[in-house]
Amino acid sequence: MRKNKAKEIIKAGKAVINGWLQIPSTVSAETMAQQGWDTLTIDMQHGLVDYTNAMPMMQVISATEIVPMARVNWNEPGQIMKILDA
């Protein structure tokens, strides 16, 4: 298991710099992952991203040291567990 860069930054008392993704595209996710963010959040609540888009986007982000995160569209345990499995 790789180290969580965001946790390390927070423990050091520094600010985590987060990017935001609302476009359902692995190309945009890969491009953003190469820009030096600490974390990238995939917005499934207000953007056009659904689970079928979010999973490959997370895979692309995970190929870098960036920590992928997701904002689910509702506080529903099933949706949260599904994206955690991604």
Model features per residue range: what roles?
Residues 1-86:
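Expand to "…catalyze enediolate/carbanion chemistry for C-C bond making/breaking, isomerization
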